[in-house]
Amino acid sequence: MSIDSLWRTVLWKQFGAAIDMFDNALVACPDSLWRQPVWPASPDPAERTEFWYVAYHALVWLDLYLSGVPEEEFAPPAPFVQGEIDSNETLPEQPYTREDLRAYLASLRLKCRDVMETMTDEQASRLVEYPWSEGQPISFLELQLYNMRHMQGHAAELSLLLGQHGVHGDAVDWETRAPDDLGDN
């Protein structure tokens, strides 16, 4: 296996594991915790701390970063609103359902695997810039590592909340690598 092929495979296996851990948290979350704040801080509006919203936030940014386009050129698929990226005032009219979020995540898992497995040297080295990069463009490849860390960070937050409320076991266990097949994840 060439280093290029090895790198793409390793990147997918670890990114896929982060996505799978995130999905495990969505599946394991009881209805009683769907609107539970993940952390005590109170941004405005407070709904932005709820389990479902943190999940939505992570998915929208996962999609944007996999696309590698500027924020102003991105729109999430229906039924999701753009507000997460371009406005602090726009919230969905009601919390997204677990089914909607899992369907979006399933499509993003496929997109992620495709991006990781087909990334060329030219694509990997293409420079992208986002407001948080403070005027310092980064490579698309580095963006994907950032994206993976962002996804895993939110998977950990959601899993921690579940654990604090007595949800334990296989549903929130560590995923070491994504499986070889796409399966049901």
Give the positions of each predicted feature.
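Short, contiguous alpha-helical
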Residues: 2, 8, 12-16, 20-23, ...
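Active-site rim elements
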Residues: 4-12, 95-102
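Hydrophobic alpha-helical core bundles mediating ligand binding, dimerization, or RNAP-core interactions
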Residues: 15, 19-22, 26, 105, ...
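Long, well-ordered core segments of solenoidal/helical folds
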Residues: 26, 116, 120, 181-183
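Residue-level signal for short amphipathic helical patches enriched in basic/charged
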Residues: 29, 61, 119
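Acidic/histidine-rich alpha-helical segments that form the ligand environment
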Residues: 87-128, 139-154
